[in-house]
């Protein structure tokens, strides 16, 4: 049997839960509800009106709900144009007896009235709504104006009056007072409807939804022609709404044994006593709620490509864009690919990758096309999927529009089966791109690129097919999971062409990286970016003649990617064993053909290796102004070695870096990593190549790294362009050399003996004077000789 005090606690807890339930529901979607609330914050009533707010301060309301009533009254003031000639506001509180809190003529300032509302103190007591209405009928609005000014009474109550309210309500309405009722807590809607003016559904509101209540009140005032508060472009709409009244009923739940008395004094006997429980339920009242709805800046759906529009006030918005978009405020493509290439996407559709991963790859592919391409894009796109076999979904360029291309991708079906990436690479290299007839006058020489999307390790070998693809001048970019990074790096060859992700969401975040890589895949060298570049080749016995020839071939292939001339790229070459040899300096060759001939003349040396001496040779004999180095141009040194003999190279390498010269180290084979890392300075500048045979796969990687770093700002005084211990001084985007005992722009001319103690400015003036005297002497002697002639 449940004890009475337990029932009391449960009833209290139940009431606290029920207070969280909504007792008024507008049957609208969340977007419309937000628009109603936003309109409520924008509406302003600006006609002459007398408004009296009647606050229920009884015990049935309680202190908490009374504070919410005050909050509603304060928010209502924000929608009113308060002034002595416009809207005047007063307030009364009632419980057992009515009490004037402040008169309508006490303040004409919105801030002052809100402060007065804030200072109202809860009274407590019985709920005598009828008595408060009679007071207003007898004495009118306290501080009100003549009858010509419309009067509005706003009753904020839970509608649980302890007296008769029908007669006072009729009397109030007979005084031409328009009555609004605003429910608080769990209102008794029947009583609020009886108190309010007609139409009742437009004059009954709910205080807990402040913006909605203000909207409804202002809308009704507009419909009654008492004021015009609907903002421009907004409209009044009617919505179905449900109002709920919380009822409590007493129900017999059983009997229990109890002792009952009898007519005879002192006599009791056992019997059955009834046990009751209280059940709470809602009575529903269907109604129509009239609200003002204003257009939203997001109504026109300005955010493209799946972006989410977030309104910021009446006219502004911002878009939350999916990855790969965000080129402007409306989620337009972030990067429009304008390069001319044949692009083939090769998508893993095997059981190894799973159906879920296949769908993610499809979504990624669609997102990429939407974000990067348009019908005017010069790229030719194709799509293939593979497992045991390869299926061409769309051949290169065989579609009329991006919409048609996306439709083909939508129609892709999961194949299942084994994962044979090597077989697929060989197939698309042979048959995936358009072939040009042998006797055609026009050669289709567009760069060819395959973007491989797979997250798993292949069941067949990928090394041979990947090498075959690169030999056929097919570029490879890999998009894969972190777990498959090793095999994909072997496929693409160049680490910069590898795009990895750790989870499906991060896959979409890699869109910008893929966009960036695609159009830079065919970039040759540094294009118009000036660069002074020196190669340092290990020609020691440890390398051998055959491998040294591979190094020369690597330098040749890399050099082909640069525009060799005095204004763009200059290249120098140093070979070394125990001693270094400058094969040619930066200013030796001014054309590509001449440079290639110079590389071919580099000879194998043999002997032990000293990388440090070679770097000192670069510093003292190659990267100098007298040997063609250009001030204000980025400078880089590429050292190719297996690490032997590099123990003495750390200090010279740091000397180069301290003078603004980048040092890249290509370590081949089973390298001595620690010594080469000290030589490179950081992981960024160390490129590990598994073997001499693999060097060819790293040509693009080296070029791209050097060219990317060559975009960095340059210090004109590093390395020092001043010869013969001159001091370089920066000045306004240029520099000058402060020379001691030398003259010329770079201190290249020795000053004549006897002039060394003169200031530098006098050297040039004295020489000018000597040259002037010589010219005058020549002129005089010439005139004399002419006079001697017959």
From Swiss-Prot:
The disulfide bonds in this chain are 298-309, 303-319, 321-331, 717-728, 722-737, 739-747
What UniProt keywords are attached to this protein's entry?
Answer: Disulfide bond, EGF-like domain, Repeat, Secreted, Signal
Residue ranges spanning the membrane: these are none
Q: Which residues form the VWFA domain?
A: 50-221, 342-518, 532-702
Known Pfam families for this protein?
EGF, VWA
**Domain EGF-like positions:** 295-332, 713-748
Q: Where is this region: Disordered?
A: 758-790
Q: Which SMART domains match?
A: EGF, EGF_CA, VWA
Q: How does it assemble?
A: Forms monomers and multimers.
Q: What is this protein called?
A: von Willebrand factor A domain-containing protein 2
What organism, scientifically named, is this protein from? Xenopus laevis (African clawed frog)
Q: According to the entry, what is the taxonomic lineage of the organism?
A: Eukaryota, Metazoa, Chordata, Craniata, Vertebrata
| Gene symbol of the encoding locus | vwa2
